[in-house]
UniProtKB/Swiss-Prot annotation:
GO terms for cellular component: plasma membrane. It comes from the Bacteria. It is a multi-pass membrane protein. InterPro entries: UPF0208. This is UPF0208 membrane protein VS_0999. The lineage of its organism: Bacteria, Pseudomonadati, Pseudomonadota, Gammaproteobacteria, Vibrionales.
Amino acid sequence: MSNRVGLASSLKDGQKYMDLWPVRKELNSIFPEQRIIKATRFGVKVMPAIAAISVLTQMVFNNYQAMPQAVVMALFAISLPLQGMWWLGNRSNTKLPPALVSWYRELHEKITETGFALEPMKSRPRYKELAIILNRAFRQLDKSSMERWF
């Protein structure tokens, strides 16, 4: 998608990659993405509430001596989903290892053989291109043609 470097671009790429990656049980044993995506989505929903509760609890009980620890705990809770998105963003821009490159090429060829239009095959694909191909394969190929890989 882009060659930008930095925290903001990694977080943005991580969000896109989270939506792009096919959440399928067949991929669980091969890739850690599904576990990271599930934990990150859970963290996005839950961690802001935990952060607020940790600070508000100290305020309600007038325990201002523990406020610094509560703020640190809140910052840590908020950082957890950000860490997941950062990891996913970096992973999406990582070049595939040679074994996965051949798998990417086989899947790409199989999809184009069945007559579906795809963007041209990349010479040095990244994980985000693999996610696109896997998504397309699960949507458009039948189970018998996918049995070879899963």
